[in-house]
Amino acid sequence: MRDWQTFPDLQKKKVSRDHLNCPATMAGSNVLWPILLAVVLLQISVAFVSGAASGGVVLSDVNNMLRDAKVVTSEKPVVHSKQETEAPESSVELLRFVDDDEDSEDISSIERQDGRTMESKKMADQVRLLTKQLNALMLRRREDYEMLEHNLRKSLRLTTNANSVDADMRSELNQLREELAALRSSQSGNKERLTVEWLQQTISEIRKQLVDLQRTASNVAQDVQQRSSTFEDLATIRSDYQQLKLDLAAQRERQQQTEVYVQELREEMLQQEQDFQHALVKLQQRTRKDGSSASVEEESGSQEANQEQTGLETTADHKRRHCRFQSEQIHQLQLAQRNLRRQVNGLRFHHIDERVRSIEVEQHRIANANFNLSSQIASLDKLHTSMLELLEDVEGLQTKMDKSIPELRHEISKLEFANAQITSEQSLIREEGTNAARSLQAMAVSVSVLQEEREGMRKLSANVDQLRTNVDRLQSLVNDEMKNKLTHLNKPHKRPHHQNVQAQMPQDDSPIDSVLAETLVSELENVETQYEAIINKLPHDCSEVHTQTDGLHLIAPAGQRHPLMTHCTADGWTTVQRRFDGSADFNRSWADYAQGFGAPGGEFWIGNEQLHHLTLDNCSRLQVQMQDIYDNVWVAEYKRFYISSRADGYRLHIAEYSGNASDALNYQQGMQFSAIDDDRDISQTHCAANYEGGWWFSHCQHANLNGRYNLGLTWFDAARNEWIAVKSSRMLVKRLPAVECQANASASGAFVSVSGSAADAAPSSGATTTTTTATAAPATVTTPKTNNSVVQFVAAGQA
């Protein structure tokens, strides 16, 4: 707020307030009223100009000013009433100085009328001047309105330019989308790197533009602050105007009071004049009465007349002295009034001239400031509109970028995931290549051995064929000889000779047959022992495979007479199940699940029979690795894992759970394996048929990793009471250390002994049957068995 130092006219007004309180200066206040009216009109014009630029802020202030003016005018009758109530007291005080002279009152009234006529003429001139100034202000306001219209048209043109900028931004966004589509379709790393660098550059440029926008916004904020300071200056001017208005109202009140006082003095003087005339009339009547009765009562009333005459003379002297004193006081008052009037006129004209000059200077200054403010406000409005449009465009671009950035991140994450998959597949392919090379080397060795064995088998088969031909030839000879012998036996003289020949023939043929059979059996046993030696040299599981990387390896589980190709990890885990893309069909029969299916490098099931032999001694643990559709990794590990035999339905046995996934397999503890053609669950529905996959079902969906892909791969999370939607899964088996195996064997010795005896009984019975059949028919039974095992080994090596 500005103080009184910045407004010298107002300071003079404040200083001369004591002079204006005088009744003589009240007449000059009538001249100030049109000047203050001009100031009000000027303030209203400034308010209109500033309101055209700044909205309705200043208009509200103008409304407040008009409301205050209404309040002041409404309060005026109350002031008059107060003055009327207070007037009698002041009139009583002024009666002391009233004179009975009519001439002085007439002179003062004539002078007042002359002063009023002069003041009315000056007021008319001032009103004309104010009308001219108002006309000039109206012309300026019209020019300002035309300027505002021009600025609005420019702002509309800027909005059209903003539409073109918006079209450019849309075209750039379309280009970004096309490049994003190209980036999605392309697979080369250089293009992706270049697009990512381009995106980084564009984002950095956008950030720089945002910094520039922030700077311009700060500049605009400074301009707005300056504008607010100008508004504060206008508020100070407005407050000064309010103060002037209050001073004007006070001067009006004082003027009205003086007018009331003068009117009361007039009335009192008239009343005194009437009283004086009545007193003269009474004196004349009394003198007449005294003249008529003077002759009669001259002598008697001479003394009384003398007394009355002396009393009248004393009263007349007193009145003369009082009138003389009043006339002297009135003359002094008139002189003082004339001096005061001269001083007031001089001060008034001087003050009015100074005030008019100051008002004109202030008017010119306000007009210049108004013009500057209007131009600045117009430029600020342009800048504000352009900034708003630019901010809207930037916000739109930012929202679009915010919407496109997650898509880009999603696409980049997809590309990274695809790249990771490709790298993992490449590593797997490399591992598979190295493993294939190793397996090829092993197979080359085994094939060379098999070729040698095949040569031996060919020789053996040739020998067998030769033996068969010899046996057939001998059999035909024996038959012919027997026929001849029978014919000779029919003859009596040749019977003794036939008996001698028949006695010699078995002795000659039996050594040949026995030698051939023994050589054939020995060669076949040699081939079988070599095959079993090759099988025994293979590792029983992946814990015996010493490798530094994950890959495919040949293993031979305990009790199995043919090798098995499976995936092994570097830390000795054997992969028994894998799901990740739904490429393999897991809706298979119970026999297929028992034998196993799929490719070890992709989706596959190792087979329930192989699981039984891998976990036969109850010394294995199971680890289930899962990844849900939100890329969360879940692990469930069981320290004890065992699958029973085929006769028991491959029953599930687990214990000692750990991991971040829930113990969902515990709901299926002790359940037999179910498939689409063999329902062994305890549910009323066919779980394997409904969810299209074999599993150890109890009540269907507590855990199922062999169901239909994207439909039936689930794992129940008891902590959250919801199912995990599994995207990929892997089941791994590993043998426990020897110490833990002994502890588990001692803890479950009975169960292991029973299962072990059953498992041992089956091979022993098979061995006995094999030996008996081999001894009974060595040439027809043993050879096909050996050939089948060799064929199985060769097929496994080729796989």
UniProtKB/Swiss-Prot annotation:
InterPro entries: Fibrinogen-like_C (IPR036056), Fibrinogen_a/b/g_C_1 (IPR014716), Fibrinogen_a/b/g_C_dom (IPR002181), Fibrinogen_C-term_domain (IPR050373), Fibrinogen_CS (IPR020837). It is found in: Late endosome. The keyword Ribonucleoprotein does not apply. SMART domains: FBG. Residues 489-498 have a biased composition (Basic residues). Possesses five pairs of dibasic residues that may be the target of proteolytic processing. Its main location: other. GO terms for biological process: cell differentiation; chaeta morphogenesis; compound eye development; imaginal disc-derived wing margin morphogenesis; nervous system development; Notch signaling pathway; ommatidial rotation; response to alcohol. Residues 287-316, 489-509 are annotated as: Disordered. Gene3D superfamilies: Gamma Fibrinogen, chain A, domain 1 (3.90.215.10). It comes from the Eukaryota. Pfam families: Fibrinogen_C. Residues 533-737 form the Fibrinogen C-terminal domain. GO terms for cellular component: collagen-containing extracellular matrix; extracellular space; late endosome. Transmembrane segments: none annotated. Keywords: Developmental protein, Differentiation, Disulfide bond, Endosome, Glycoprotein, Neurogenesis, Notch signaling pathway, Signal. Residues 1-51 form the signal peptide. Disulfide bonds join C542-C568, C687-C700. Glycans are attached at N372, N587, N618, N660, N744, N787. Involved in regulation of neurogenesis. May encode a lateral inhibitor of R8 differentiation. In conjunction with Gp150, promotes Notch activation in response to Delta by regulating acquisition of insensitivity to Delta in a subset of cells. This is Protein scabrous. It comes from Drosophila melanogaster (Fruit fly). The lineage of its organism: Eukaryota, Metazoa, Ecdysozoa, Arthropoda, Hexapoda. The gene is sca.
